[in-house]
Design a protein with these regions (language model features):
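Extracellular glycoside hydrolase catalytic/binding regions
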Residues: 82, 240-397
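Aromatic-lined substrate-binding rim segments of carbohydrate-active enzymes
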Residues: 70-162, 230, 262-266, 289-305, ...
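Aromatic-rich peripheral "rim/lid" segments of glycoside hydrolase catalytic domains that contact
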Residues: 388-441
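Short catalytic/ligand-binding loop motif for oxyanion handling, primarily in non-cytosolic enzymes
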Residues: 55, 109-113, 148-157, 282-285, ...
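Active-site-proximal beta-strand/loop segments in catalytic clefts of secreted hydrolases
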Residues: 36, 46-51, 104-108, 143-147, ...
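N-terminal carbohydrate-binding accessory modules
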Residues: 17-100, 135, 139, 172, ...
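Cleavable N-terminal signal peptides of Sec/SRP-targeted secreted and luminal proteins
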Residues: 1-19
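Aromatic- and acidic-residue-enriched segments that line the glycan-binding/catalytic groove
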Residues: 117, 147-241, 326, 415-419
Length: 441
């Protein structure tokens, strides 16, 4: 009976992989290529990310997105932002000369319950967006977007149920920073702007404890998380969640399950060519993190064999690869996983640029050196700086700028609407500056 079950499971897995449609874009050595011709392609375009419920835009409307989130409307509380992504948006994106989007598929929104399934409403929206991009040949990175780890720690990305498993005794408690991170003043949460609004007031921190939208409802979170302070990511509750995710065990299994389900959902959508496993992961456990990337990549490949899958370092920074020149890119990564990277045919290195190193051209050189070391392409999947844009153009490096729209209507800039009943998305953790027509001439 056991052998029969094993055979049935194996057959089902093989059938799923065989049923997946070929991707629009694939990887060949250190390049992205068009699957139909094998021609190298540089992918460019915007981020399309919704950080709160319903976590994806609706495919509706007939005009392309234009945000109004300037200082004047913020002061008046009458800003406007987009809630849709439609044919007019695709046409506009193509008119700008772009050929891809980085689409947020936030774990907290895609899988709000600890179960072997994705949320039906999330799937409905996802399929509608990917049907649209399939019809138009617009390449899509599926970005497990998060900032400063988890809702339970005033960040976003990792779902509340996961934090409850990782650190149940810290849910709804004042945020604290443990060793060794508390020794670095700039990332100690007590030094984060807005922390003093609640400080150690346990009653205030306990409000909405355990709610999936804690990060948008609790006043202590709201006092700190409109910008994107690193102090939130290195708190004890968020580091417990990261450890639970990257170390071997049930937390890593949960993360891999999420990506297996996401890959299965995208199997019939050839435009969904890539999976970015986690936006800006906040952990110094590099070896365990790369082993987790490997486990997730293998699960994705079992569903969609030619889907490109990201590797990334802490915060997706462009600084760590300075190790390449002296130590090789695999420092702190197991020999087995380093070998797996070099022997792969579907991995790419995802990175961001927000001013480190100070010279964006040096950042690009760092990334190209890492790509050469591992024989993988690199992709700058987030940035705002025109210097980085132009450096990538000069080096034929793919990029996705932050961002097409804020895709949010929460907080005072939008009149303090009731979350989540009257709002869309989440205006937090670096939400402003949406620009559907960004240029860097």
């Amino acid at each position: 009976m056991y052998i029969l079950c094993a055979l049935l499971v194996g057959t089902a897995t093989t059938a799923t992989a065989a049923a997946a449609q070929p991707r629009l874009v694939k990887i060949q050595d250190q390049n992205f290529v068009l699957a139909t011709t094998g021609e190298s392609v540089v992918l460019t375009g915007p981020n399309v990310v919704v950080k709160g419920p319903p976590y994806l835009p609706e495919v509706s409307g007939s005009t392309f997105c234009v945000d109004h989130t300037d200082d004047e409307c913020k002061a008046a509380g009458n800003c406007t932002s987009c809630t849709s992504f439609n044919q007019a948006d695709v046409d506009h994106i193509k008119s700008m000369g772009w050929n891809q989007i980085r689409l947020g598929v936030v774990w907290a929104g895609a899988q709000p319950r600890d179960e072997d399934a994705l949320d039906p409403e999330f799937l409905r929206r996802l399929h509608e967006v990917l049907d649209l991009t399939d019809r138009n040949g617009l390449a899509v990175i599926l970005d497990n977007h998060g900032d400063m780890v988890a809702s339970a720690g005033c960040g976003n990305g990792v779902p509340m149920w996961f934090s409850k498993k990782a650190a149940p005794e810290l849910i709804g408690k004042p945020l604290t920073t443990g060793l060794p991170y508390k020794l670095v003043p700039s990332i100690n949460v007590k030094n984060t702007e807005g922390y003093d609004h609640c400080g150690s007031d346990e009653a205030k921190w306990a409000a909405f404890a355990g709610d999936p939208n804690y990060n948008l409802l609790n006043e202590c979170c709201l006092a700190m998380n409109s910008p994107n302070p690193a102090g939130l990511g290195w708190t004890e509750i968020n580091q417990r969640a990261m450890d639970f995710m990257v170390l071997p065990g049930p937390g890593r299994d949960d993360f891999v399950r999420f990506w297996r389900l996401m890959a299965a959902a995208a199997a019939d959508h050839p435009s969904a060519f890539a999976a970015e496993l986690m936006n800006e992961p906040m952990t110094i456990r590099r070896g365990a993190m790369f082993d987790t990337w490997r486990a997730a990549a293998e699960a994705i490949s079992a569903e969609v064999p030619d889907m490109s899958v990201s590797l990334s370092d802490v915060g997706e920074g462009a600084v760590l690869p300075e190790w390449v020149g002296e130590h090789d890119a695999g420092v702190f990564i197991s020999t087995s996983t380093t070998r797996w990277i070099r022997e792969s045919s579907n991995l790419f290195y995802a990175w961001h640029y927000y001013g480190q190193p100070s010279d964006p051209q040096q950042a690009v050189r760092n990334m190209l050196a890492l790509g050469e070391s591992w024989n993988v392409p690199t992709f700058m999947t987030e940035f705002m700086d025109c210097g980085a844009w132009n450096a990538c153009v000069a080096a034929n490096v793919s990029f996705s700028y932050w961002h097409y729209s804020a895709y949010c209507t929460t907080g005072p800039a939008f009149g303090d609407l009731v979350v989540p009943d009257e709002t869309f998305g989440g205006c937090m953790l670096g939400w402003g500056g949406g620009d559907s027509s960004k240029t860097c001439a």
